[in-house]
Amino acid sequence: MKLSFSLVFNALTLLLQVCIFAQARFSNETDMQALLEFKSQVSENNKREVLASWNHSSPFCNWIGVTCGRRRERVISLNLGGFKLTGVISPSIGNLSFLRLLNLADNSFGSTIPQKVGRLFRLQYLNMSYNLLEGRIPSSLSNCSRLSTVDLSSNHLGHGVPSELGSLSKLAILDLSKNNLTGNFPASLGNLTSLQKLDFAYNQMRGEIPDEVARLTQMVFFQIALNSFSGGFPPALYNISSLESLSLADNSFSGNLRADFGYLLPNLRRLLLGTNQFTGAIPKTLANISSLERFDISSNYLSGSIPLSFGKLRNLWWLGIRNNSLGNNSSSGLEFIGAVANCTQLEYLDVGYNRLGGELPASIANLSTTLTSLFLGQNLISGTIPHDIGNLVSLQELSLETNMLSGELPVSFGKLLNLQVVDLYSNAISGEIPSYFGNMTRLQKLHLNSNSFHGRIPQSLGRCRYLLDLWMDTNRLNGTIPQEILQIPSLAYIDLSNNFLTGHFPEEVGKLELLVGLGASYNKLSGKMPQAIGGCLSMEFLFMQGNSFDGAIPDISRLVSLKNVDFSNNNLSGRIPRYLASLPSLRNLNLSMNKFEGRVPTTGVFRNATAVSVFGNTNICGGVREMQLKPCIVQASPRKRKPLSVRKKVVSGICIGIASLLLIIIVASLCWFMKRKKKNNASDGNPSDSTTLGMFHEKVSYEELHSATSRFSSTNLIGSGNFGNVFKGLLGPENKLVAVKVLNLLKHGATKSFMAECETFKGIRHRNLVKLITVCSSLDSEGNDFRALVYEFMPKGSLDMWLQLEDLERVNDHSRSLTPAEKLNIAIDVASALEYLHVHCHDPVAHCDIKPSNILLDDDLTAHVSDFGLAQLLYKYDRESFLNQFSSAGVRGTIGYAAPEYGMGGQPSIQGDVYSFGILLLEMFSGKKPTDESFAGDYNLHSYTKSILSGCTSSGGSNAIDEGLRLVLQVGIKCSEEYPRDRMRTDEAVRELISIRSKFFSSKTTITESPRDAPQSSPQEWMLNTDMHTM
């Protein structure tokens, strides 16, 4: 019996082992089959053929990329990262039930992530980054409860982040960056209390960050940059004191940062908040974050000063505060430089595009010797470049452009031998260009344009063999162009325009095969244009106008990339080459004011009369009809003729004599006309239309505008200005209602007014700026120059029409006047337009002529600022041009609206616009014009309103409307202060007026009902009552 039991036990044990072995073999077969199915949908783009080992000749646990467990010999790791595999991820991968690590990163897998990945309940590490995956993130991943790392970054995944991921309680790293994810930030992710890294950057997510994020107390790295998140700075983040890296850049966050920011997040090493809408001041408590290494809050709306406490951040190596409103134009705006000199690790400092004023301090030379990038451009910095600037021996990028720097470059500047980029343009730096620039052999960009440099161009620049950009235009350089600079093989752009250079243009230019743009216009160059220029095969822009070049146009037929060419105002002769019509990219061609002869082509660019200018060439003919050139005479073939009689010979001689005399008179008249024309052009300083007008894709002809305005009929005349008349017209096949401003070119400065409007509208667009539809630069029916600008028509006329009682009959709806709320809306529109021009344009613009007649209203009474004929691009400012080109009724100001400093020769500025806006605001809400006869001497609209308000208290008004009007007038007073430094900024004015509107003018009755339906005191009545009460 005992023996029988032992036999049975052994038999059962053996049977169990056989079953286990069979089960293991079956499971192993399942893993192998899953791997082979995965391989079947994959191909390789490399020579290694790593999957070649995946076959039956060897155990699958020995296959490349496969790791098995020792006990069960099941696949626990599939690591194929970086093998350059293509194809799709097979759903069979979900059968590897013992898998703990799955790494398919850095391949080219496409299609979607299989839902069956959710079967891998033992999975701890999942990395499918840097592939071509698309579709949704599978919600089934929530079944993989042991996951600690999920990296799906750098794919094309879309839709939202699955809220189910919030159940992965062990997740430490979640990286979904660089995809196409949309939707909101899931509140359920607040359950991931083990999360240390979250990266959602480079997606399209939106909404606010939920408060549940505050529970992520283990978080070290939080990055959601380059999305569309909004709201204030997420309050939840203030609770995560463990944060070391925080990036919210390139979103739409707004509001102020808390003053105790640095106390709440003391462990930060990286803080990136750039390109949002944050306002207020930079928290001084940031100095408490002693570990801070990189801080960037560029491109926001911050104001105030740059904290001196930054000097305590000894680990700081990157400080970016570019493009804000810091400094307030104060002379103390640069004091922080002395403080950050204590940041001995500093490598990058960018405070450009702010309002930093005062002289450039000598302490700049005490900045860290590790500093490689220094950006102070686009501010209001004056003084000279300090003599010890050469101490910054590691400097690679130096940006001081568009300030008010003067004096000569110091000798020590030549010690900066590591410089690669030098931006000094648009200052008042003088002296000769130092030869030591030739020792900076790493230079790539040298921008010295728009200064007061004189003397010769140094030959030593030829040693800068890596130079890409060489900008020296708009200085006082003389002498010849050194051939050495035209032997720099890397040159892409060279601009020597607007100087006093003489001699021939060197033939060495033909060696610049990479040259894209060449400008040598408005110099004193002579001789023939270099024939070798035809070898610059990459050329797109060629400007040689305003010189004394003669002879024929060189052969540029191989320059197939040419877009803009200007050879005007020279002495070029011969025929216009036909191959110009065959250049496929040519969009603008100016050959005017030369001595060309013969037939003008009619194909290619010559088909468009508005893209080609040939006026001032007296011996040309043909061309398209719109050019209005004389027809070409076809010469008859010679034939045998009978001898003339004596009488016929006498008659013929007399006719020939008379014809010769007439010809002499005509030629003399044309020469006089050309000379006068050239003189007028020179006095106007007219640059090439082709470059400025290149932004308008479709220009209209004179004939089209002539027809659209019924031959510029007086019945269509809707306004007159300093430089011309404005007509109403119906343009194009759709009869679009437009306003056509025709310039009177006989009036001095009119051409510059035309160019100023074109230049200003290049690249700007705002709902409160009048829309410039197109332009016309052509000849009229009599062959005279014709310039016109075509705007969107504003049916409600100008604000001036509404403000003047004598013009009310011209308003469409003359039975009513503007309500206080409507006036406030208009004021906000104007202020918003100015804020855009002053702050948000790439090149800030000063309008220089804000007044009621330049504020146009559409059907909804939305205001549009118009008439940019006097506008100044502040970063291209030319003081002499400002002082001389316009009359006192021009840019120096319309009397009553112009800033006081303009009357003393001050330069155009955004502060001048603020003054004009303040006067406009006072006029709108006081009922008095700034030119009222009661004003004399120092007693003006500003002082009048100020004296009225000083006699009333904040509760002096009879109702909320009156209180609102009082606050509006206070804004007008702050904007129209005598001294620019005391005036309110446009962005402050916008915020203040919006706040007043929301508090005092937000009711439905106030905004929408007319005075007949909802009686209320007008601003004029309120001022009158207050005046009588207080005077």
From Swiss-Prot:
SUPFAM superfamilies: L domain-like, Protein kinase-like (PK-like). The active site is at D849. It is found in: Cell membrane; Endomembrane system. The modification Phosphotyrosine is found at Y791, Y836, Y897. GO terms for biological process: detection of bacterium; immune response-regulating signaling pathway; plant-type hypersensitive response; regulation of anion channel activity; response to molecule of bacterial origin. It is a single-pass type I membrane protein. The modification Phosphothreonine is found at T709. Belongs to the protein kinase superfamily. Ser/Thr protein kinase family. SMART domains: LRR_TYP, S_TKc. LRR repeats lie at residues 98-120, 122-144, 146-168, 170-193, 194-216, 218-240, 242-264, 267-289, 291-312, 315-335, 345-368, 370-392, 394-416, 418-440, 442-464, 466-487, 490-512, 514-536, 538-560, 561-584, 585-597. This is LRR receptor-like serine/threonine-protein kinase EFR. The lineage of its organism: Eukaryota, Viridiplantae, Streptophyta, Embryophyta, Tracheophyta. InterPro entries: Kinase-like_dom_sf, Leu-rich_rpt, Leu-rich_rpt_typical-subtyp, LRR_dom_sf, LRR_N_plant-typ, LRR_R13L4/SHOC2-like, Plant_RL_S/T_kinase, Prot_kinase_dom. Residues 1005-1031 are annotated as: Disordered. Disruption phenotype: Enhanced susceptibility to R.radiobacter. The gene is EFR. Residues 712-1001 form the Protein kinase domain. Constitutes the pattern-recognition receptor (PPR) that determines the specific perception of elongation factor Tu (EF-Tu), a potent elicitor of the defense response to pathogen-associated molecular patterns (PAMPs); phosphorylates BIK1 upon elicitation to regulate immune responses such as defense hormone expression (e.g. jasmonic acid (JA) and salicylic acid (SA)). Reduces transformation by Rhizobium radiobacter probably by inducing plant defense during the interaction. The chain crosses the membrane at residues 654-674. Residues 1005-1020 have a biased composition (Polar residues).
